[in-house]
Amino acid sequence: MKQSPLHRPSRPLLALGIEGSANKLGCGIISHSPSPTGGPTLVMVLSNVRHTYITPPGEGFLPSDTARHHREWVVKVIEEAVRKAGVRMGDLDCIAFTKGPGMGTPLQVGALVARTLSLLHNIPLVGVNHCVGHIEMGRQITSSHNPIVLYVSGGNTQVIAYSQQRYRIFGETLDIAIGNCLDRFARVIGLRNDPSPGYNIEKEAKKGKRLVQLPYGTKGMDVSLAGILHSVEAYTKDKRYRSWDQVNDVEEDIITPYDLCFSLQETTFAMLVEITERAMAHVGAKDVLIVGGVGCNLRLQEMMGIMASERGGRVFATDESFCIDNGIMIAQAGLLAFRMGNTMPLEKTGVTQRYRTDAVHVAWRA
């Protein structure tokens, strides 16, 4: 096994992470400290504060409105993160921000605030890839060594394996992301956006009794989700469909919103399990790490766990404080890069809406 090029810190290091690529605004402070016994570096989450922009049922979130929310809340969220961590801005060794991918205007809010704080307090800046942040926080929390990563969120669906200091994308969505698919269907059937559309679909799917037929779109290690979204939406116009207020126990041959939530989950998650298993077979991996907001879904974890156990492996996942977009994952990835000497001059801190996971040089791993 190759030795990591990342040296143990000689003193405690602190990083502030700012995340705002979509409707979650998060700020967190993390510390990396030398172990008194000479063991692995001690990593401690000092604060992890988040504020979510929530729209009315049936509505998504527009970039301009989301950016307005972030501008309104970013100072309050940073102040709370600093207060909870019990540190001062001058104590920070670096400020990390989400460089991309994500929605342009919300990303710019986080980058602008990071630049301002950097200039005010003379603190180095580190731009972080959003997906790499998810992966590094997932690895840290779960202590998983070298798993296949399934990254599932509102804007991304990727199957990833690490090789030669890159997170290589083995498969991905060919059209829309799984989180986008779930969110859009939730809007069609009138589910609330609080706490999230995907969570509400998961809750209602547990009451589903009927698995309706939906297209199954896998190709190699890629998936296509636009067709399945169109098909499940079409069921809401079927004469057998009954909306929430029309569902009763008398009629038998009906299709309910519960059935459609159940069917959409079962079919799309089966597709995700299939492409993940294919990637595992390709690289000889046994373990899976699920990251991203959809990774909180317990049914997805259960289905993936069945597959992994049959292969003699395990599934790793985190709770909602870490799988949903947050600032601490940006702080973690940023501090790893900082420890390798990777910082950004001010003129290089522009945001990149389409920032590929495999574009990042993962210098801190062997």
Curated annotation (Swiss-Prot):
Protein keywords: Activator, Acyltransferase, Cytoplasm, Metal-binding, Nucleus, Transcription, Transcription regulation, Transferase, tRNA processing
EC number, UniProt record: 2.3.1.234
Cofactor(s) essential for the protein: a divalent metal cation
InterPro entries on file: ATPase_NBD, Gcp-like_dom, KAE1/TsaD, Kae1_archaea_euk, Peptidase_M22_CS
Tagged with keyword Cell division: no
Gene coding for it: KAE1
Comment on bound cofactor: Binds 1 divalent metal cation per subunit.
Subunit structure: Component of the EKC/KEOPS complex composed of at least BUD32, CGI121, GON7, KAE1 and PCC1; the whole complex dimerizes.
Protein name: tRNA N6-adenosine threonylcarbamoyltransferase
Gene3D superfamilies in the cross-refs: 3.30.420.40
Binding-site positions, a divalent metal cation: H130, H134, Y151, D325
Subcellular localization, as worded in the UniProt entry: Cytoplasm; Nucleus
Protein role: Component of the EKC/KEOPS complex that is required for the formation of a threonylcarbamoyl group on adenosine at position 37 (t(6)A37) in tRNAs that read codons beginning with adenine. The complex is probably involved in the transfer of the threonylcarbamoyl moiety of threonylcarbamoyl-AMP (TC-AMP) to the N6 group of A37. KAE1 likely plays a direct catalytic role in this reaction, but requires other protein(s) of the complex to fulfill this activity. The EKC/KEOPS complex also promotes both telomere uncapping and telomere elongation.
Predominant cellular place of this UniProt entry's protein: cytoplasm
Family to which this protein belongs: Belongs to the KAE1 / TsaD family.
Keyword Thylakoid: no
Source species: Cryptococcus neoformans var. neoformans serotype D (strain JEC21 / ATCC MYA-565)
Catalytic reaction list: L-threonylcarbamoyladenylate + adenosine(37) in tRNA = N(6)-L-threonylcarbamoyladenosine(37) in tRNA + AMP + H(+)
Entry binding sites for substrate: Y151, V152, S153, G154, G155, D183, G198, E202, N297
HAMAP family, sorted: Kae1 (MF_01446)
A single Gene Ontology CC term: cytoplasm
A GO molecular function held by the record: chromatin DNA binding
One Gene Ontology biological process: tRNA threonylcarbamoyladenosine modification
